[in-house]
Structure formats: C-alpha cells, structure tokens
Amino acid sequence: MLFRSVIYRSFVTNSYTNIASNGSFNALVNSGIIHPTAVLICPFIGATPNVGFGDFQWKSPFDTCPATMSPLSLTNLQVGIGGQNVLNSTLNMTYENFLQQVNLAEQLTSSDFGVSTGLISQSYWEMSKWYFVNVERGILADKLQPRNINVSFTNNSNVPIDVIIFTFYSDQLTIDVETGIVTK
C-alpha cells in the first residue's frame, strides 16, 4: 500500500467579553489541544453601552474592524502551554516583541521568510494592535500530547475590551493513494 501524509494547520477560537479597564484576565483558553503552534489575541473595544457602539466593534458597519483593530494596550501578557510559561517573563509587547514572535511563524526552514516580510509596519501595528505568541517550541513527544492553554494579561486601556483568541495547531491526515481512503 502507498500512503501520503498531509500536515495542515487549523484553529480554534474563543471570545471573552467585557474585560474592565485596568482589569486582569486569566483563563484556560483551550483544553486538550495537540501540537499547538501559535496563539493570536485580538482585542476590540467592548460592546458595553458606556462606550457608544451598543454592539460588538467588529459587527459595526461604521468601523473598519476587523480589517483593522484599535490601538488597545495589553500588558503583563503571558501564555502557558501544559503548565509551562512560553514567554520568559510577562510581556509588555512592543513592535519588536511582535516581530520576534511572528518571525518564525509559518517558517519551514531557516532560509524561509515566514510571515516577517515587512508587510506589517510599526505604525500599522501600533494603531492596529494584535498580539501573536509563537508556542511551537519543545520536543515532538511533548507536542503530540494534549495540552491546556492558559492566557493572562492586563487591559491597559481606558475602555472595557472584548477579545477573540485564536489557537492555531497542526494536524495530520493520511491518504491511501490506491483506494483514496482518508484517515486521521
């Protein structure tokens, strides 16, 4: 029999609403994810009546969101995989930190560019912040075990926020070339 393996990336989303101004956020975002590769945190202005939208920012026809974000600040950022912190210390993310995290995303070899080809400038990132953490470190045996993903941060903005957290992970399927049967 002749088999071919297909490795692909998929993602899971979670949304959290009404994180107070200067409030802390700490949550188990996903449980049992095998081979997580990245966590993307997208903050939006909260849907509370005090802010004026009355609905989610990303649903408003008068806002360019989600194509662009708001310059919302998250401090003391930390992502934990299986009880181990990914970042050496809690992070007050700057554009340089963002580039360090994004630099290895989708990079197959050391000569690949990945996604760090300069399409996201510093001024664009500062006015449209999202927070990317590359979690693809570790040995293969650890990656193949189900892991819990924890995210914590402080909302350093003057308004309540909502966040959507994307958890990216690698998955694999096998195709029997002779019969066309696909197995996971």
Regions picked out by a protein language model, each given a short descriptive name:
Residues M1-K184:
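Flexible assembly/topogenesis modules
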